[in-house]
C-alpha cells in the first residue's frame, strides 16, 4: 500500500534525509561547468545537480536556445542567465548523452549500468497521446484544486467581473477590510500604527499556509507523485511550494497591486511600499517578477503544467531517489512543451523561457527566505507560522 502525506499536514512530519551515495566526489570536487559543488560524475564530467538537470533537459527535450556570440562566463551566480553559452560549455567540456550517468546511485546500480549497452536516448519519448492525457489530467486537477484561477483573476483585474474588489490603500481601509468587508475578523489582532507591518506580515502567512495546503492536494493528484518515497514527497513540497506560490501569485497582480481573499480585496502596491522596514520589502520583488512573468501571457492550462513541473524537480537536496523524480518531471515537461507549441504558435522560445523562469523563482524564494529569517530575528512580535517555520528550516 502506498504511503501518503496526511491531508492537513503537508511537509511537516519528516525532515529530509541525505542520500548515503552523496559522499564520494561531491565533498571536494567542483562542477566543471559553473564551479558549484559537484554532486557526482554526470554525463562524462563532474557536475552539480543544476548543470546535470540543465544538460539532461536540453538533450531530452531537444531544446534550442537563442544564439549568443558573447561567450558568456558561466559561474554559479549567473549560470541561468545565458542558456546558449551554458549548453556550449557543457559540450566543450565533454558532457555527452552517450556518457554513463553515475551521479548519486548505489554501487549495484552503477555496475548494472556499466554492464548494459548504452543507447542514444536515456528514455524513449512518451507517445503523443500519453502526453495529451497527462496534460488533461494535470489541468483538471489544477482547476479543481485552486478556485482563484488566472482567468478569474484577470476578469476581476480588468473589470470584466460584475463585482469589484474592496480597495485597501491605507490604515482606514485595512481596518474596514479586517472588520469583515474582505476577511473574517481576527479576534487576537489589534491594528495600531506600530503594528501594521506585523499585521500585514501575518496576513501574508495566512495566505501562504492556505496555498501550501492546496498545493499539497494538487501534488497528490499529479500522476506518479504518490509512487515516490514519502521522504521525497515531503522534500519536493518543502522546496517547491514557495516557488509555486510566487508563480501563481503573479496571476493576482498588476502594476498597481494584488488581489487578496479570493478576489474580494485589492491591496495597492503603494500601500505595501509605505509599510515600515523591513515589511515594505516583502512584496516588491514579487511585483518585479510578476511583470516579467505575466508578459509571457500564460493561461491556466499552461500554468497547471508549469506548477507541476516545479513541484516534481529532481535536483532538490535530500531526495532518496532523484532519478525517479526526474523521470516524472520529464514527462510533465514533455507535455508542457507540446502544449505550448500547440497553443502559443507565435512564441517558439516560450518553453526555454519558462525553464529560465524556474531559476528566477529559485532566486526569488532564496531572497524571500532570507528576509523572513531576518524579520524573525529582529521583530519580536512577528511570529512565524509553525508550518512555514518547518518549511524554511535548513532550507537556505
From Swiss-Prot:
Family: Belongs to the nuclear hormone receptor family. NR1 subfamily.
Keywords of the record: Activator, DNA-binding, Metal-binding, Nucleus, Receptor, Transcription, Transcription regulation, Ubl conjugation, Zinc, Zinc-finger
Coarse class of the protein's main subcellular location: nucleus
MF terms (GO), sorted A to Z: DNA-binding transcription repressor activity, RNA polymerase II-specific; nuclear receptor activity; RNA polymerase II cis-regulatory region sequence-specific DNA binding; zinc ion binding
Tissue: Ubiquitous.
Subunit record text: Heterodimer with the retinoid X receptor.
Entry-linked SMART domains: HOLI, ZnF_C4
Lineage of source species: Eukaryota, Metazoa, Chordata, Craniata, Vertebrata
Zinc finger (NR C4-type): 31-51, 68-90
GO cellular component: nucleus
Modification after translation (UniProt): 'Lys-48'-linked polyubiquitinated; leading to proteasomal degradation. Deubiquitinated and stabilized by OTUD3.
One of the Pfam families matching this protein, by short name: Hormone_recep
DNA-binding span(s): 28-102
Name of the featured protein: Peroxisome proliferator-activated receptor delta
GO biological process, one term: positive regulation of fatty acid metabolic process
NR LBD domain residues: 166-394
Compartments in which it is found: Nucleus
Amino acid at each position: 500500500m502506498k504511503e501518503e502525506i496526511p491531508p492537513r499536514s503537508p511537509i511537516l512530519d519528516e525532515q529530509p534525509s541525505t542520500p548515503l551515495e552523496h559522499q564520494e566526489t561531491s565533498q571536494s570536487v567542483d562542477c566543471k561547468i559553473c564551479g558549484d559543488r559537484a554532486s557526482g560524475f554526470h554525463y562524462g564530467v563532474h557536475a552539480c545537480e543544476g548543470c546535470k538537470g540543465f544538460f539532461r533537459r536540453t538533450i531530452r527535450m531537444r531544446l534550442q536556445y537563442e544564439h549568443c556570440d558573447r561567450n558568456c562566463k558561466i559561474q554559479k551566480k549567473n549560470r541561468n542567465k545565458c542558456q546558449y553559452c551554458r549548453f556550449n560549455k557543457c559540450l566543450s567540456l565533454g558532457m555527452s548523452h552517450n556518457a554513463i550517468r553515475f551521479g548519486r546511485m548505489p554501487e549495484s546500480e552503477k555496475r548494472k549500468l556499466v554492464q548494459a549497452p548504452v543507447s542514444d536516448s536515456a528514455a524513449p519519448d512518451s507517445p503523443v497521446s500519453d502526453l495529451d492525457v497527462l496534460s488533461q489530467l494535470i489541468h483538471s486537477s489544477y482547476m479543481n484544486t485552486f478556485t482563484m484561477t488566472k482567468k478569474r483573476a484577470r476578469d476581476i483585474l480588468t473589470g470584466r467581473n460584475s463585482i469589484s474588489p474592496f480597495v485597501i490603500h491605507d490604515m482606514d481601509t485595512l481596518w474596514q477590510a479586517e472588520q469583515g468587508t474582505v476577511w473574517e475578523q481576527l479576534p487576537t489582532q489589534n491594528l495600531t500604527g506600530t503594528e501594521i507591518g506585523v499585521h500585514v506580515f501575518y496576513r501574508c502567512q495566512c495566505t501562504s499556509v492556505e496555498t501550501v495546503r492546496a498545493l499539497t492536494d494538487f501534488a497528490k493528484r499529479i500522476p506518479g507523485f504518490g509512487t515516490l518515497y514519502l521522504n521525497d514527497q515531503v522534500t519536493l513540497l518543502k522546496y517547491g511550494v514557495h516557488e509555486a506560490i510566487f508563480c501563481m501569485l503573479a496571476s493576482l497582480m498588476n502594476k498597481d497591486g494584488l488581489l487578496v481573499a479570493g478576489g474580494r480585496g485589492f491591496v495597492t502596491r503603494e500601500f505595501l511600499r509605505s509599510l515600515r522596514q523591513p515589511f515594505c520589502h516583502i512584496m516588491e520583488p514579487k511585483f518585479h517578477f510578476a511583470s516579467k512573468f505575466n508578459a509571457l501571457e500564460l493561461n491556466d492550462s499552461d500554468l497547471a503544467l508549469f506548477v507541476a513541473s516545479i513541484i516534481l524537480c529532481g535536483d532538490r537536496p535530500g531526495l532518496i531517489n532523484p532519478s525517479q523524480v526526474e523521470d516524472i518531471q520529464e514527462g510533465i515537461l514533455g507535455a508542457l512543451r507540446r502544449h505550448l507549441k500547440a497553443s502559443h504558435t507565435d512564441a517558439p522560445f516560450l518553453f526555454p523561457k519558462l525553464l529560465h523562469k524556474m531559476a528566477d523563482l529559485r532566486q526569488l524564494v532564496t531572497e524571500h527566505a532570507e528576509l523572513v529569517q531576518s524579520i524573525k530575528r529582529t521583530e519580536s512580535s512577528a511570529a512565524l507560522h509553525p508550518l512555514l517555520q518547518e518549511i524554511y528550516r535548513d532550507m537556505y
